[in-house]
Amino acid sequence: MQCSYPLARQLERSSALNNNLFQKAAIWLVIALVLFTVFKQFDKPRAQDSVTYSQFMDDAKNGKVSRVDVQGRNLVVSPKEGSKYTIISPGDIWMVGDLMKYGVQVTGKADDEPNVLVQALYYLGPTLLIIVFWFYMMRQMQGGGKGGAFSFGKSRARLIDENQNAVTFADVAGCDESKEEVVELVDFLKDPQKFQKLGGRIPRGVLLVGPPGTGKTLLARAIAGEAKVPFFSISGSDFVEMFVGVGAARVRDMFENAKKQAPCIVFIDEIDAVGRHRGAGMGGGNDEREQTLNQMLVEMDGFEANSGVIVIAATNRADVLDKALLRPGRFDRQVYVGLPDIRGREQILKVHMRKVPIGNDVDASIIARGTPGFSGADLANLVNEAALFAARRSKRVVDMQDFEDAKDKIYMGPERKSTVMREEERKATAYHESGHAVVAKLLPKADPVHKVTIMPRGWALGVTWQLPEHDKYSKYKDNMLEEIAILFGGRAAEEVFLNAMSTGASNDFERATKIARDMVTRFGMSDSLGAMVYVDTEQDGMFGKLSSKTVSEATQQKVDAEIRRIIDDQYALAKRLLEENRDKVEAMTNALMEWETIDAEQVNDIMAGRPPRPPRGAQGPNSGGNTPPGGSPVAPTNAPATARADETV
């Protein structure tokens, strides 16, 4: 029985392929037939204007013509010298007698009977070509889906039968609270009488809200898998097309199909593509989206009962959804699926490690502590990258070193070992990263330094990587001020030790300025401006979100002055710390020049005044380098908030 589904899918795929080939062959056959008919019609011999009838009769009289074939008014003349030509007879009744008198052989042929099919193709051929081309374009716009050009109103929802869906709650880890919120749906789908006897009504719609990659789709499939009911899956963008009314028709068709399979689950991924609040835009496309949303509102809670169909939707933009969509009776329950904590990350890692041969030295709890901020998708990618590292090294199992290398690659980008840079540029990068690391170690509330490297990775020439000791859910003023000082440690080290400035600190400045601005304008952390919000407000308008200024020019000048004060104070703090600890910066720079990468143990040795021990798997100074001047100073996009990624040029 396990082979029946793959075999059925293979037969279905083969049948679809054969149908597609047959349709293409039929189209090209029609085109070829029409073209052949047209060319044949135009291929008939035409009368030549170069020889007149009078000249032809003179040639016949002078014995220059041997034969004439008469076919209607067309005369095919065969001269004694030269090639045949055709002329049109003017209707001379004495012509045949004269030709025979001149000794010309005359033959007659009946006119060709007109072929009705050929004439029909000749006159209707262009119209047929236009119709065939129109059908072809309609199928192309529909992606070759079932039904062709007349399937616009058909739902694109994909039905996953209860016997095909093998996902259960055991496959979902790291979101125990979210699973508890939806377990009632499973009980209702298994035994609806239990709730109906007491007059209870199960939520008709559940909205899963959370960042990307946290397992919203997986949780919806697990609900259907646990309840053993059919599962319809569709994306919000599949409803709206270029033709008016298609979206509403697809919504109706989807719910009609779902009611036939009830009890069942309809899962709409990225519902914000069709469920955005109405009135925030203009134009035909916006009207079509609103019609689709209106139809969805009616289907979920209108005059007609929708018993047995539970709608589960997922989005990471719940703030843009229409209020009518979120009211009780439609999506009356919102379940937040957030980033997993350290325990959740450990559970997720163990789920994904089931499919990978793991070494005895691998500890999921240690990996979980070193991956704060990772989503479930990130952790799945981490396990996959570790397996790829092990495969490249021809290992039989995936060990802890493979996970460390995979984590470094995801956090900081892939190594660019082939990049070669001059010695002075490597040293400038080493001073820059040492400045970040030393300032981070000297500030009391900063996150511990996990690794420092001048090995080029991704867009960065060097990275100072900090990891928090535990998950953080809020920040305090002291933490944010220290974060700004750490960001300025790189530029301050360049000034103190090299008496120079590079473009490598540009990303540091962007992030430091943003933190300082948020402290003043959003979080009320300014003593002079007080606990007020000074950011521009946003409101819904005809063209979407519109922002308006809420502060005067004089107040804005005070805001800018306060941001400047915070920046200057933290830059001065970073510079003072480096000047007071020159020996530590020099020692760390020398260690980076020798090994290119040092970890937390070597950093602690240097800060304690001890010679740094050689790191495990130390790399020589010639194993890589930095990019030449002129490279982009932008940090890698996958660097976490606690990583310092800089490019020194």
UniProtKB/Swiss-Prot annotation:
<feature type="binding site">
    <location>
        <position position="436"/>
    </location>
    <ligand>
        <name>Zn(2+)</name>
    </ligand>
</feature>
<feature type="active site">
    <location>
        <position position="433"/>
    </location>
</feature>
<keyword id="KW-0812">Transmembrane</keyword>
<dbReference type="InterPro" id="IPR011546">
    <property type="entry name" value="Pept_M41_FtsH_extracell"/>
</dbReference>
<dbReference type="InterPro" id="IPR037219">
    <property type="entry name" value="Peptidase_M41-like"/>
</dbReference>
<dbReference type="Pfam" id="PF17862">
    <property type="entry name" value="AAA_lid_3"/>
</dbReference>
<dbReference type="Pfam" id="PF06480">
    <property type="entry name" value="FtsH_ext"/>
</dbReference>
<keyword id="KW-1003">Cell membrane</keyword>
<feature type="transmembrane region" description="Helical">
    <location>
        <begin position="116"/>
        <end position="136"/>
    </location>
</feature>
<dbReference type="InterPro" id="IPR003959">
    <property type="entry name" value="ATPase_AAA_core"/>
</dbReference>
<keyword id="KW-0479">Metal-binding</keyword>
<keyword id="KW-0067">ATP-binding</keyword>
<dbReference type="Pfam" id="PF00004">
    <property type="entry name" value="AAA"/>
</dbReference>
<feature type="binding site">
    <location>
        <position position="508"/>
    </location>
    <ligand>
        <name>Zn(2+)</name>
    </ligand>
</feature>
<dbReference type="InterPro" id="IPR005936">
    <property type="entry name" value="FtsH"/>
</dbReference>
<dbReference type="GO" id="GO:0004222">
    <property type="term" value="F:metalloendopeptidase activity"/>
</dbReference>
<keyword id="KW-0472">Membrane</keyword>
<comment type="similarity">
    <text>In the C-terminal section; belongs to the peptidase M41 family.</text>
</comment>
<dbReference type="GO" id="GO:0016887">
    <property type="term" value="F:ATP hydrolysis activity"/>
</dbReference>
<feature type="topological domain" description="Periplasmic">
    <location>
        <begin position="40"/>
        <end position="115"/>
    </location>
</feature>
<feature type="transmembrane region" description="Helical">
    <location>
        <begin position="19"/>
        <end position="39"/>
    </location>
</feature>
<keyword id="KW-0547">Nucleotide-binding</keyword>
<protein>
    <recommendedName>
        <fullName>ATP-dependent zinc metalloprotease FtsH</fullName>
        <ecNumber>3.4.24.-</ecNumber>
    </recommendedName>
</protein>
<feature type="region of interest" description="Disordered">
    <location>
        <begin position="606"/>
        <end position="649"/>
    </location>
</feature>
<dbReference type="GO" id="GO:0006508">
    <property type="term" value="P:proteolysis"/>
</dbReference>
<comment type="function">
    <text>Acts as a processive, ATP-dependent zinc metallopeptidase for both cytoplasmic and membrane proteins. Plays a role in the quality control of integral membrane proteins.</text>
</comment>
<feature type="topological domain" description="Cytoplasmic">
    <location>
        <begin position="1"/>
        <end position="18"/>
    </location>
</feature>
<comment type="similarity">
    <text>In the central section; belongs to the AAA ATPase family.</text>
</comment>
<dbReference type="InterPro" id="IPR003593">
    <property type="entry name" value="AAA+_ATPase"/>
</dbReference>
<feature type="binding site">
    <location>
        <position position="432"/>
    </location>
    <ligand>
        <name>Zn(2+)</name>
    </ligand>
</feature>
<dbReference type="InterPro" id="IPR003960">
    <property type="entry name" value="ATPase_AAA_CS"/>
</dbReference>
<feature type="compositionally biased region" description="Low complexity">
    <location>
        <begin position="616"/>
        <end position="626"/>
    </location>
</feature>
<feature type="binding site">
    <location>
        <begin position="210"/>
        <end position="217"/>
    </location>
    <ligand>
        <name>ATP</name>
    </ligand>
</feature>
<dbReference type="GO" id="GO:0004176">
    <property type="term" value="F:ATP-dependent peptidase activity"/>
</dbReference>
<dbReference type="InterPro" id="IPR027417">
    <property type="entry name" value="P-loop_NTPase"/>
</dbReference>
<dbReference type="GO" id="GO:0005886">
    <property type="term" value="C:plasma membrane"/>
</dbReference>
<dbReference type="GO" id="GO:0005524">
    <property type="term" value="F:ATP binding"/>
</dbReference>
<comment type="subunit">
    <text>Homohexamer.</text>
</comment>
<keyword id="KW-0378">Hydrolase</keyword>
<feature type="topological domain" description="Cytoplasmic">
    <location>
        <begin position="137"/>
        <end position="649"/>
    </location>
</feature>
<keyword id="KW-0862">Zinc</keyword>
<keyword id="KW-0645">Protease</keyword>
